[in-house]
Amino acid sequence: MRRSFVCVLALLLLTALTCFSQQTDIRQFTVFGAFSYLSTPSLNLTQRGFDGDLGYNARPWLTFGFDFSYNNGHSSVLPNYLNSATQAKLAPILPILQELGIPPAIPYNSSTYTYEGGPQFNYRRMQHVTLFARPALGLLHGVFSAKPNNPVIAELVNGLLNGSTSKSDNVVFYGFGGGITWEITPKFGLRVATDFVHYNYFSNLLSGGRNSVRVVVGTKFNFGKNIVGKK
């Protein structure tokens, strides 16, 4: 994934070096759809999915948009990921797991939905390339589904989640992002973007907040009237 991202970014940057005239055709609306890669290192969690957004170009340099993404992946919860209260509950059980030769890890599946809206600031001094930056602020909906791999872990999950194997949470995330678009034509382009965000979900189980990095690669379609001339 990283190699593909670097190759696409290098292609866009090389294109930028040959395109230094200002854009003269900027459509009023944009629709973007992309493959999404979401990494949360503190949980050793990698998720993949899709991202889509709608944008309104109020000015060549200013876009207002709404973004939605869905990502899914799996990993395992380890004791050091948990907050002190939850670790205290586990303390009497860990020696028993060790005697039985059972690793103290809970496999799980995770789904992450994000909803985001706000401004984007564009640099359009190159004819076929747009650089942009934006604040990241929105709502994150996380769904955790435990996948116990033996009866002992299943009982442990039931105890921690009050008889359930799944849990969900809604939290606010914040951060920043940016990227580059290769404007192949006034109505079609390729975009690479990345966002860095911070949030604190499942705080009654997990310790501290989380940082995640999202990378998206996809196509952008532009339509509506040409807004060049607005300042």
Task: Briefly describe each language-model feature range.
Residues 21-58, 64, 70, 214-231:
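Short glycine/proline- and aromatic-enriched beta-strand/turn motifs that initiate or cap beta-hairpins
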Residues 7-16:
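Bacterial N-terminal signal peptides
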Residues 61-66, 127-129, 182, 186-190, ...:
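Repeated loop/turn-to-beta-strand initiation elements of outer-membrane beta-barrel proteins
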Residues 27, 46-50, 74, 109-115, ...:
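Residues that define the transmembrane beta-barrel architecture of outer-membrane proteins
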